[in-house]
Structure formats: C-alpha cells, structure tokens
C-alpha cells in the first residue's frame, strides 16, 4: 500500500507546479517590498508560557497569523497606518489594541492573555455582521477556530460541521452520492439555512443546494455558526440560522502545500500562496485537487452486478487580487473555478457540476469612525446528470431513465455601513443587498419498461425555468444602557419578484410530436423580519441570554417552476407560492464556575408555517385540478400547506485542566413534528416527525498538544434515530475519528487522519421498511496520510 500511496502522491504533486513557482517568486520579491510588519509573542498571563494556535488578525486589509510553538507571529507587508490588532485563543480573554506601522518598519507587539471563556473565546462577525466578542452576543453561536479546523479528522468542509450537534446533515458524505447537498439547523428541514463563504451566498441559484467541495478545507481560516432565525440580517433562507465559512487571508510571501492520500485510492493535493506583485498590489493563489476514496454505497448483502464504487473528482482554482494602499481602505477581485465530476454508484449514473464565480469588494474606513463594506458577485453553474432505473431481479442491470442539464446564473451585491460607539449605542449598522437568479431544468425521459420493444426509447422532453429578483434592507442597533445588559435590535424588509416562468414538454407518438408550451404569470411578495436579543451578565461567571425572531424563506426556482411529467403523473409549476416563515424564541446561559471548565445551554422553540410541499390536486381540492393536468391519473403542484414545530435544547461543556489538554462535548435534542394535515385524534406524541432530523445527537472531542508529541485529536459522534426523505426509519449509530499531526522539521508537518476507526457499518438510506428494503451504508474506515509545508 505504501508504494501505491507514494506513487499517487507523486502524481498529485504535478498540479502544484505553477503555484510553487509563484511561491518562489513571492519569497524573493517579498524582500523588496516597502510595507511594514507587526510581530510579537503571545503568552499566558498566569504561567508566562507561550500560547500555541492563537489567532492574531487585522480587518483592513485582511491579515491573519497563527502563533507557533514559541507563541510568535508575524503580520507582513502592511501599508503605513494605524491598525486594530485582535488576538484570540481558546480559554483566553480576547485582546484588542491599536498599533501604528510605518513603511519598511517592523513593530513589536507582545500580547499577554488573561484567562477567559473556553467556548466563546473568539471574535466573530456573523452574529451581528461586525466584529464582536462571542461571549457578548445574545445568540447561540459556535465557532471552529483555525486550530480546531486544522486538527479536525474531517476531510471535507461539510464534515467539519458534524461536531456541532445543532447542525443536521445527511448521513451521506459529500464525497459520495449526488450533488444536491443540503444542511439544516435545529430541525428546520432541508434548504432553510443560509450558507456563506466570505460573506457571499453559497446556496446555488436553482435549488439552493450547496457544493461543499467549492469550500476546500485547506482554504479555511474558521467557521462560525449562528443558530436560530437570522433573516433580520441575512434575509432569505436564514430560517434555521447562518453558517459562515471564512477563507484564510494570505500575507504576501505566505504559502502552504499539502499532499495526502490513503484508503481506496484517495489522492489529494493543494497549494496556496500569497504573491506580492507591486507596491500595495498582491495576489492569493489557491489550487486544490482530489479524487478517489469512494466506496460501494449498497449493503453487500443486497448489492448486485449493477452496483459499483461511487467516486468523485473535485477541482478548485482560486485567484484573488488585493489592493491595500493604506490602513483605511482596501479592495479585492476574485475568480474561482470549481468542477465536480462523480458517478453515483452505478455504471450509467453520474452528476457533474462546473461553476465560475467572480467577486469584488471594497472596504473603507474604521469601525470607530464608520466602516463601509461593498460587495458584488456573479456566479454561473452548469450541471449535467443521468439517473437510472434498476431492473427487477437482483440488481443485475440498469437502464437510463432521465438525463438533465441545469444551467443557472446568479448575480448581485451588498452594501453595509457600521459605526461603533455612536449615538449612545455600542454599534449601529445599516445595509442592503440584491440577488438575481435565473435557471432552467432541461430533462429527457426514457422508457424503462425493460426488457421490451420500447426499452430505452425517448418518452418525452421537458424544459422549465424562470427568474427571480430578491432585494432587502436592514438596520441594527446594539446598546448597553447599563453595564450588565446588552440589547440587540435588528429588522429587515425583503421583496422578491418571480418572472419569466415557462415550460415546454414534447411527447413523441407514432405519427407526430405532442407539444405543450406554457408561460406563467409574474408575482411579487414581501417579508418583514424583526429580531430582539438580550444578554445579561448576572455574575462574573454567569450570563443569561434570550431572543425572539421572525424569519422567512422565499420559494426557489426549482419549487416555483420545475415541471415533471410521466405517463401516469404530472407536477405543474406554481409561480404564486408564498414565503415560508418562522417565529422563534430561545433562552440560554453561559456559566464558567472556574477558569478551566465552562457550560452553556439553550432551550428553543420555533413554529414554521407555509412550508411548500407537493400536493395532489383533485376536482374538489383547493385549488381544484386545472386543465394543465391533462388526463393523467395523478396531478400535483406545490402549495403552502405544511406547518411544523421544532422544540428542543442543546448543551455544551468544555474542560481545559492543563495547557496541553482541551476536552469538549455537546448534546442536542430536537423534537420536530408536523402540525398540519393530521388525522383526527392525533396527539402531540403521535404527530409525525419531520424527516431527516436526527435526535439526539452527541459529540465529544479531545485534543492533546505538545511540542514533543504533536497534536492528538479524537472525535466521538453519535446520531440517534432519524428518517429518510421518504419517512423510513434509520437506526442510530456511533463513530470515532482521530487525527495525529506533528512538526517534522520547522515549516513541515506530517499528519495521519482516520475516519470511522472502528469500521462501523451504519445506514445512510433505506429504500423501504422491512426485509425488502435496500440499505445504503456510510463511509467505512478511511485512513489518510499526508504532509504539509507552510510559511505563515
């Protein structure tokens, strides 16, 4: 196996050639740059020992440094000016101070950090859309710090989220299965959580699906998760909360290169470099490539000749140009190319995605005098897929049932102005954004009566699509009228317009084609999303927080306009769908009775209304069956008819008994049940659960770090009972993952990651209940071995 691994790593290394050359150029050119530097050491106030893994950052231009084993850091190539330097570390109180830098100089800024929060030690931006200590916000927030991201056994950005118990993901890894990937928070159901990468939406334009592969782990600085409805700041889709990924800012001259491989022919290579160009102009270059590591999804007890290994190839190429002439303003332009090619478990089935994203931004000013942030983005995606029907009799053969192409395009922008300590407020923000979506679903259906004379013949073609414009504006005021009390008030108004709905389906007959063309009317809707949050510091060790919010989600293009036709059924578009909405309440506490242990917990309840779901139409239904349904037996459309309630709680604990050891754990219980369409006599205990919401969930994480032995991390995950999308119950499961990494020589570390150490066999899907059901299984034991070279 070792010789095979070396061979694969050598093959993957070829993708790094150009970026390596750029890195060498960066190292040589950096010497001639005229910018200033900030360097220093971060130490423990009690023991005076250096702190490893502290995050030292400035906001404009964006720079981040992580302290090494000696607690040292360097922020390189800064334009002359005054900066607010923020330092954070787990178990330490965040530090913020101003530092002035002149051209060509190096300023020393040593930081002595006092003991602080174990669970809320970071400075975050997603909870209020401006920097604030996590321990001050009136929300339930969870942060994966740069060190936690680096030490995680997870291979994918999606899998990083699995250790946050309130985040619900499909059991299927994003490395296998289809491209339509989703996420949920607190049982709000799929597709109703905002996901952002550097402040720009990741949810795609057609179905709000997420390509986790376009956020490779090697690019990440940190992850912030805000739980509960956040539409008052983020607008559409943030019914369950917001997940924000932040890329690692690369200083000119910085670089990382990673090569790894492992189980089932897995190969991965990545490189990133900060390249000085001229004066205040620099570039960030990132390349990431991976393939292999897949497996046969079908339980071997039921697998047949048609079942093969599900595989994926993912490619990322990223370029960012940065211009930072002063400490008061900076600008950037980015281009990002992403490709995902996969088979989905049989020889004929596949799903491919290609994306091109272009972003630009401008930051001006400072939070103390007024900080303006402008963003614009443009994204294009083309997806191609083929689905198959498995013939009866032992899964021995398959036939193409559908091929589809799904082109989509979205573009938009945002503006935000924030000022701190003004008008008797701690912070005041106003902003707005706009996003345009357009897309089509073009499918070709084939006859699957096989074997037979019509097997494989064209059954019909269906093309449907439309466009949507969505805009909103928000305002936020944060006040601390008395020292222990902090009040967060925010509100937002959104409007969306559904336009250009259309469909065309063509069914061939023996003599001609039957064509049905339809145009759909335009519609407009609005939503109002307020939020009130309170945090009260009852004692120095105990704080309480509570919040009330309303949130919404506009229907996406797939829900509005996708038309589906078969010989026995039809699903017709509904361009007049209303918004889904949520009304939620939560209350929680943060308690740190002694310096080395902390607890936090939250109770929440949220009512979700107007969920749109496919609904059968009949002559007596409301609305009644229209003429568009034709003569088929079953006619459906999406209607806003479902209601649900999510009620539950979560608890977190962190223990930091010695500097080298950090332990944390969490548990989430979510009772999420349907509230509408129930038969008479249904009680609270017999109301059906919302599908694909596991409960309970538990995680335990332990990390031991030392200069001699390196970093050792173990992660325990348990998911309780859940259901498939079709409502079939899945058994609970438990897995343990681990990661070990150690510096080999200065600037080079080796690592070994193992997912599912016990090779636990667990269900990720089940076609039907009982013995006839065919189970898909989760990822078996997966070992990866690699090396990373770095210069921060």
Give residue spans per PLM region.
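Periplasm-facing N-terminal accessory domains of Gram-negative outer-membrane beta-barrel systems
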Residues: 28-123, 163, 168, 186
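Transmembrane beta-barrel wall of Gram-negative outer-membrane proteins
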Residues: 263-291, 301-341, 350-371, 422-426, ...
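Surface-exposed extracellular loop regions of Gram-negative outer-membrane beta-barrel proteins
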Residues: 339, 380-384, 438-440, 445, ...
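Gram-negative outer-membrane beta-barrel transporters
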Residues: 480-487, 495, 599-608, 628-724
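Extracytoplasmic beta-strand/coil segments of soluble accessory domains associated
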Residues: 158, 162-201, 221
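Outer membrane beta-barrel strand-and-loop segments of large Gram-negative receptors
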Residues: 310, 318, 408-417, 462, ...
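C-terminal beta-signal and adjacent terminal beta-strands/loops
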Residues: 552, 609, 614, 741-792
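Short acidic/polar hinge/loop motifs at secondary-structure boundaries
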Residues: 183, 200-227
């Amino acid at each position: 196996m070792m010789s095979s691994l070396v061979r694969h790593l050598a093959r993957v290394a070829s993708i790094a050639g150009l970026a390596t050359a750029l890195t060498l150029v960066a190292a040589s050119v950096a010497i001639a740059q005229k910018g200033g530097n900030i360097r220093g050491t971060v130490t423990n106030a009690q023991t005076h020992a250096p702190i490893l893994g502290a995050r030292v950052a400035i906001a404009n231009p964006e720079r981040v440094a992580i302290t090494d084993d000696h607690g040292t850091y360097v922020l390189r190539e800064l334009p002359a000016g005054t900066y607010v330097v923020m330092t954070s570390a787990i178990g330490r109180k965040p530090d913020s101070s101003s530092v002035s830098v002149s051209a060509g100089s190096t300023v020393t800024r040593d930081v002595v950090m006092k003991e602080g929060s174990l669970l809320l030690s970071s400075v975050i931006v997603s909870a209020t859309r401006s920097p604030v200590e996590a321990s001050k916000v009136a929300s339930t927030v969870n942060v994966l710090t740069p060190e936690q991201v680096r030490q995680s056994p997870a291979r994918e950005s999606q899998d990083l989220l699995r250790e946050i118990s309130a985040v619900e993901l499909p059991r299927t890894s994003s490395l296998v299965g289809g491209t339509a990937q989703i996420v949920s928070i607190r049982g709000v159901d799929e597709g109703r959580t905002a996901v952002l990468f550097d402040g720009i939406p990741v949810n795609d334009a057609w179905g709000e699906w997420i390509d986790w592969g376009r956020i490779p782990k090697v690019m990440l600085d940190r992850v912030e998760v805000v739980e509960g409805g956040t539409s008052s700041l983020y607008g559409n889709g943030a019914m369950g909360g917001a997940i924000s990924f932040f890329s690692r800012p690369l200083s000119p001259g910085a670089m990382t290169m990673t090569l790894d491989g492992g189980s089932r022919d897995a190969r991965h290579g990545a490189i990133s470099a900060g390249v000085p160009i001229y004066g205040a102009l620099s570039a960030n270059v990132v390349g990431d490539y991976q393939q292999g590591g897949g497996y046969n999804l079908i339980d071997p007890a039921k697998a047949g000749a048609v079942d093969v290994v599900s595989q994926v190839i993912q490619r990322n190429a990223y370029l960012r140009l940065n211009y930072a002439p002063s400490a008061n303003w900076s600008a950037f332009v980015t281009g990002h190319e992403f490709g995902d090619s996969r088979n989905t478990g049989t020889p004929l089935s596949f799903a491919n995605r290609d994306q091109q994203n272009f972003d630009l931004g401008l930051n001006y000013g400072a939070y103390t005098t007024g900080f303006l942030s402008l963003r614009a983005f443009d994204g294009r995606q083309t997806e191609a897929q083929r689905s198959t029907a498995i013939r009866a009799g032992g899964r021995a053969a398959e036939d193409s049932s559908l091929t589809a192409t799904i082109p989509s395009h979205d573009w938009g922008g945002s503006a935000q102005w924030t000022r701190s300590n003004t008008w008797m407020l701690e912070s005041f923000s106003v902003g707005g954004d706009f996003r345009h979506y357009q897309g089509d679903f073009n499918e070709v259906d084939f006859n699957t009566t096989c074997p037979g004379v019509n097997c494989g013949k064209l059954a019909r073609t269906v093309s449907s699509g439309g466009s949507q414009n969505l805009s909103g504006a928000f305002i936020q005021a944060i006040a601390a009228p008395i020292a222990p009390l902090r009040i967060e008030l925010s509100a937002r108004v959104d409007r969306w317009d559904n336009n250009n709905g259309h469909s065309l389906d063509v069914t061939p007959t023996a003599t001609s084609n039957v064509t049905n063309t339809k145009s759909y009317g335009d519609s407009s809707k609005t939503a109002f999303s307020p939020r009130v949050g309170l945090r009260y510091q009852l004692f120095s060790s105990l704080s309480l927080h509570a919040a009330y919010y309303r949130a919404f989600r506009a229907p996406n293009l797939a829900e509005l306009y996708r038309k589906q036709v078969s010989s026995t059924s039809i699903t017709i578009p509904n361009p007049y769908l209303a918004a889904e909405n949520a009304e939620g309440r939560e209350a929680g506490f943060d308690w740190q009775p002694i310096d080395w242990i902390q607890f936090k917990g939250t109770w929440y309840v949220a009512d979700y209304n107007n969920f749109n779901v496919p609904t059968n139409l009949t002559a007596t239904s409301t609305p009644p069956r229209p003429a568009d349904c034709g003569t088929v037996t079953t006619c459906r459309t999406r209607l806003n008819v479902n209601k649900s309630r999510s009620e539950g709680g979560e608890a977190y604990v962190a223990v930091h008994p010695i500097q080298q050891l950090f332990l944390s754990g969490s548990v989430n219980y979510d009772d999420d049940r349907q509230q509408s369409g129930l038969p008479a006599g249904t009680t609270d205990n017999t109301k059906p659960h919302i599908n694909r919401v596991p409960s309970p969930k538990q995680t335990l994480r332990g990390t031991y770090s030392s200069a001699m032995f390196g970093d050792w991390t173990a992660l325990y995950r348990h998911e309780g009972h859940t259901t498939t999308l079709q409502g079939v119950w899945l058994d609970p499961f438990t897995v343990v993952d681990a990661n070990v990494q150690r510096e080999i020589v200065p600037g080079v570390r080796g690592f070994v990651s193992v997912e599912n150490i016990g090779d636990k066999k667990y269900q990720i899907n089940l076609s039907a209940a009982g013995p006839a059901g065919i189970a898909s299984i989760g990822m078996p034991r997966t070992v990866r071995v690699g090396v990373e070279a770095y210069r921060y």
